[in-house]
């Protein structure tokens, strides 16, 4: 083999004319003389064939036009870690240093610059070597000697091809806790547990767009005994398996932008004891359920406080009912699901979700203040009051026996009655339709005690309750979690201020009219 070819060239990653590829063959390709590299391109449009040339199969590609042959001189096999570090951070590699002859020290040219460079390298804690063609650790021991204080390293989109080559780097960085390896194509290790000491302090790992499937992650997981945060975005993952004796310290898992269809796949990770945050946005999930209990709290995800399901296919309220079973769920992000469009008024959807999930404190990254929760729960209790009565509910506790179907559709309704009391008949007779009226009032919103806040004009339905108006104003005015006091001045009764004291009454109850001024105090 040509002396210029790396001994481990096969399966190595290269760059050629700005395109990334993996070497699949090293050797002759008759009748053309000379050495050739058979490569599989990341961009299959760059290739010409599937590894077969003039009837002879030299290598295999995952795409029928993903392969081609190139000359050795066109392949860049990358640089070592320190070379890339010096280049990225503007440091020169000097070879001159002190020379000791007997007992006499001779200072060679460039020694001061070496000391200065070494000082700069020693201070580095967070480094980014993205797209720097890094492929190896370089000379043994040089990394720990030059930059031992690195804690966070971005090595995304480089030329690493094996976990062993990465272990040679990380084993020299004892303080390394966060590592980004996104967009590297890594071959599986034959003995991953033997590399655990090299990654023993690693807490955050990103493997986005690496093509690694979940089963491959589990095969590698013994390498990361202390891992707390794992990012696997855009890896075409469709199936999950239950981790056994690994990933037990995981607190954050990001599997967004994958191809998970069945929400029950999440059951496989439901018993990771420390898992607090799951991000499963932009998959194809339409349902999530926790069948271990019909009502009450599930034994799954016992530590989960935050869930993101943005951009999925969730369209049924039963999914929200299921999420109520998560005892510690405090934050939910669910934008971009069909459910959010079921009612044209996003405020109504928000109120329903808040009422259905008891411990929720943030919805779509917006804080839920106590007054908003109270209003949402009271509105929910009133909105479905007639349905509750028809299903066997009663203001008389002795006869209050709503059907199982009703309780499955509204699992929190009984708790809301215990909290606020049953809705009376008068309340239910005055119940407004589910959809808001078309009668909109143009109101000027003023904060008389906050002169720095400019008046705002807003169109509100006259059927909107005072409580819902308060919820809107909390977000609109970015008011801290204190009680709002609302009143209004009629355009027909100048100087007279009327207090809106009952949160459950609509604006029309107080005869608020078009052009009136809404006064907000806190």
From Swiss-Prot:
Keyword check for Cytoplasm: yes
Cellular compartments per GO CC: cytoplasm; cytoskeleton
Gene3D superfamilies named among the record's database cross-references: CAP Gly-rich-like domain, Phosphatidylinositol 3-kinase Catalytic Subunit, Chain A, domain 1, Ribonuclease Inhibitor
Keywords linked to the UniProt accession: Chaperone, Cytoplasm, Cytoskeleton, Leucine-rich repeat, Repeat
InterPro entries per the UniProt record, alphabetical: CAP-Gly_dom_sf (IPR036859), CAP-Gly_domain (IPR000938), LRR_dom_sf (IPR032675), Ubiquitin-like_dom (IPR000626), Ubiquitin-like_domsf (IPR029071), Ubl_TBCE (IPR044079)
Highest taxon, organism lineage: Eukaryota
Domain CAP-Gly positions: 27-71
Function: Tubulin-folding protein; involved in the second step of the tubulin folding pathway.
Listed name of the protein: Tubulin-specific chaperone E
Chain's gene name: tbce
